[in-house]
Amino acid sequence: MAGSRRKSPGITPEILLRAYSIGLFPMAESADDPEIFWVEPELRGVLPLDHFHLSKSLAKTVRRKPFEIRFDHAFDSVIAACAEETSGRPSTWINKTIRSLYATLFDMGHAHTVEAWDGDKLVGGLYGVSLGSAFFGESMFSRRTDASKICLVHLVERLRERGFTLLDTQFTTEHLKTFGAIDVAKADYAVMLAAAMQSPHLKF
């Protein structure tokens, strides 16, 4: 995780939004660690909204509509699922403080979810933060094949429709790169972020 890290003795929702506006985001070492630190990567993950890549197979799955997609319906359940340890994710950086802070951002209209439902079961989802014309993706989970991928497709569609200009993924992964995610140098990211912060806060 190249970049700077600095511990924070206490964070309010207002401080958290300010941090996002200048390129910082919070993490914890583990779900059980109460400490939170700020992260500012040297290379920032960005998913260009005008160069989103959707494979033919996933596009076919999306058209089949295997799940009901909901927005902002079950925020607490989504972040709790993202914080769960799984066989593929033995540890998580989402501690109780982070869950509480983002729940408050949700109440303020700055944190949002995209959710995949199979009947009355939440089977996949993601959450993130909107500010200006930027959306900062935080975490995702999947309990069914392609559920989180389908949520990402619907997120990008939503952001395009609403006029968002920046989808920040924090870091790139091989998984995100298949959708077109790229690494952006800190200085270049700062320019992109500043432009997004000049926009009025867009409705998600």
Curated annotation (Swiss-Prot):
> One GO molecular function term?
leucyl-tRNA--protein transferase activity
**Can you state which reaction this protein catalyses?**
N-terminal L-lysyl-[protein] + L-leucyl-tRNA(Leu) = N-terminal L-leucyl-L-lysyl-[protein] + tRNA(Leu) + H(+); N-terminal L-arginyl-[protein] + L-leucyl-tRNA(Leu) = N-terminal L-leucyl-L-arginyl-[protein] + tRNA(Leu) + H(+); L-phenylalanyl-tRNA(Phe) + an N-terminal L-alpha-aminoacyl-[protein] = an N-terminal L-phenylalanyl-L-alpha-aminoacyl-[protein] + tRNA(Phe)
The answer, when asked if Translocase is one of the entry's keywords, is: no
InterPro entries to which the protein is assigned, alphabetical: Acyl_CoA_acyltransferase, Leu/Phe-tRNA_Trfase, Leu/Phe-tRNA_Trfase_C
Give an example GO biological process: protein catabolic process
State where the protein is found.
Cytoplasm
| Cited Gene3D superfamilies | Leucyl/phenylalanyl-tRNA-protein transferase, C-terminal domain
Keyword check for Lyase = no
UniProt GO cellular component terms: cytoplasm
Keywords, alphabetical:
Acyltransferase, Cytoplasm, Transferase
Q: Look up the EC number in the record and give it.
A: 2.3.2.6
Its family? Belongs to the L/F-transferase family.
The UniProt entry, under HAMAP family, shows: Leu_Phe_trans (MF_00688)
Q: Which NCBIfam families match?
A: aat
Biological function: Functions in the N-end rule pathway of protein degradation where it conjugates Leu, Phe and, less efficiently, Met from aminoacyl-tRNAs to the N-termini of proteins containing an N-terminal arginine or lysine.
Q: What is this protein called?
A: Leucyl/phenylalanyl-tRNA--protein transferase
Q: Which gene encodes it?
A: aat
